[in-house]
């Protein structure tokens, strides 16, 4: 008697990089150039990581002093505003620790001083996962993602992860200061046009938007025609379609 074969369903190719295969993390370090960069790139994923029990720490490299429209506003005032906004935004996502390195906004370059300071943060917080900017200019996406500060932070962070943070012979003064070498397991780079690892943020998209709205100096400017809620939902919905979710963020996932 002939038997009917049961077809084995294959998971769609777009889902093969889904977060169902991501390990649990105890400590996560998010290294970004400016206040509001973490939320735009990975706010939903970081809220999810925090909900799952990870201790997520932000490292904001610049002072955010170029993120304003009024040339008469004092730098010190804008810096203070942006730091308050960043702390408030982080709290919405369940993130309690925010470190500010204080580099001048718009003046970053990938150099040894920046690498050393990021290595110090990695050795201090000992993350298993680091999230940071893409270290290369992307020509098929809006230019905002390829801000020169983003490129500098992305490249410096990648170099800090490997080889510097694990190498006892790199930045030896850090050893004397008590910062022992540390090995990072993974790096995630937000990459919304060409990401191949999708994190389902359907349950955290509202948290992401609430966090972004704390950056009032950036998303609620008088006369602005930009609807951040509409823009973010569309972008993360489009990414979600690729990953098989209602809303998603996409990353390049690198095993160190």
Model-derived features: positions:
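Metal-dependent de-N-acetylase/amidase catalytic core
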Residues: 2-29, 112-256
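Active-site rim/loop-helix segments in enzyme catalytic domains that contact anionic ligands
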Residues: 2-128, 252
């Amino acid at each position: 008697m002939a038997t009917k074969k049961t077809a084995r369903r294959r998971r769609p190719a777009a889902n093969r990089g889904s977060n169902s295969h991501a390990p649990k993390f105890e400590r996560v370090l998010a290294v970004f150039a400016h206040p509001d960069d973490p939320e735009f790139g990975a706010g939903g994923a970081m809220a999810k990581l925090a909900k799952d029990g990870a201790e997520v720490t932000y490292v904001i490299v610049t002072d955010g002093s170029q993120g304003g429209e009024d040339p008469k506003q004092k730098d010190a005032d804008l810096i203070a505003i942006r730091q308050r906004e960043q702390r408030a935004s982080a709290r919405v996502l369940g993130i309690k620790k925010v470190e500010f390195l204080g580099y001048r906004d718009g003046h970053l370059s990938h150099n040894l001083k920046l690498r050393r300071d990021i290595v110090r943060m990695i050795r201090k917080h000992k993350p298993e996962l680091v999230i940071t900017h893409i270290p290369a200019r992307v020509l098929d996406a809006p230019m905002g993602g390829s801000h020169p500060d983003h490129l500098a932070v992305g490249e410096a962070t990648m170099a800090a992860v490997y080889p510097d943070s694990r190498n006892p012979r790199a930045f030896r003064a850090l050893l004397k200061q008590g910062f022992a070498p540390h090995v990072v397991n993974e790096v995630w780079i937000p990459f919304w046009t060409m990401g191949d690892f999708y994190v389902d943020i359907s349950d955290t998209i509202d948290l992401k938007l609430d966090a972004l709205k704390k950056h009032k100096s950036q998303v609620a400017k008088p006369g602005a025609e930009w609807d951040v809620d509409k823009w973010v939902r569309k972008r993360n919905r489009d990414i979600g379609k690729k990953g098989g979710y209602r809303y998603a963020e996409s990353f390049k996932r690198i095993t160190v």
